[in-house]
Regions:
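Post-signal-peptide N-terminal segment of Sec-exported extracytoplasmic proteins
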Residues: 33-73
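Short aromatic-glycine-(Arg/Gly/Cys) micro-motifs in beta-strand/loop hairpins
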Residues: 42-51, 91-107
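Bacterial signal peptide processing site
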Residues: 19-21
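Short metal-coordination and nucleic-acid-contact micro-motifs, chiefly zinc-binding Cys/His arrays
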Residues: 28
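Sec-dependent signal peptide recognition
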Residues: 3-9
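C-terminal partner/receptor-binding element of secreted or periplasmic proteins
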Residues: 116-144
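Mature extracytoplasmic domains of secretory-pathway proteins
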Residues: 57-91, 98
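C-terminal motif of bacterial Sec signal peptides marking the signal peptidase cleavage site
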Residues: 14-17
Length: 144
């Protein structure tokens, strides 16, 4: 009976430790997995979560995209980016619309900014000029 309880307890512990979900970014403390800079910009940070629950944090979308060149993307469960209009809010990167505008600087100088909705990106385009991209177009731009 004691062995059964231990097995159940271990199973529950293991099952709960493999939670696949985003983790909050500790701005000013967490470092970018790709470039090692401290993550401070709440409008441009990004994160990926593997299918095993491992989280990689980035100071910019461009660092995340460059990191994707070095890993098996089939193991990524979640791609997340910060919404420019809601600093600190992680959104689904595959559903976001991206603006490349030299009038909105990003941490790594690629001027890449994510928006939760296409309309928000179009509104920003009218103000800042530049080019709009979908997730698939962004992957092509980064040769992914």
């Amino acid at each position: 009976m004691v062995n059964y309880r231990i097995v159940v307890l271990l199973f529950l512990l293991l099952a709960s430790s493999c939670n696949v979900g985003p983790k909050p970014i500790a701005y000013g403390t967490d470092g970018c997995h790709f470039c090692r800079m401290t993550i401070v910009d709440r409008q441009h940070a990004a994160e990926i979560v593997t299918d095993k629950g491992k989280v990689f944090k980035f100071d910019s979308s461009e660092c995340m995209m460059n990191h994707l060149k070095d890993i098996d993307q089939k193991q990524v469960a979640l791609y997340l980016v910060n919404d420019y209009n809601q600093p600190g809010e992680l959104i689904d990167a595959t559903e976001a619309t991206y603006l490349i505008s030299d009038r909105i600087p990003s941490p790594m100088g690629e001027f890449l900014t994510a928006f939760k909705t296409e309309q928000a990106a179009v509104d920003a385009l009218m103000t800042y000029d530049g080019d709009l991209l979908t997730w698939d177009q962004l992957k092509l731009r980064f040769n992914l």
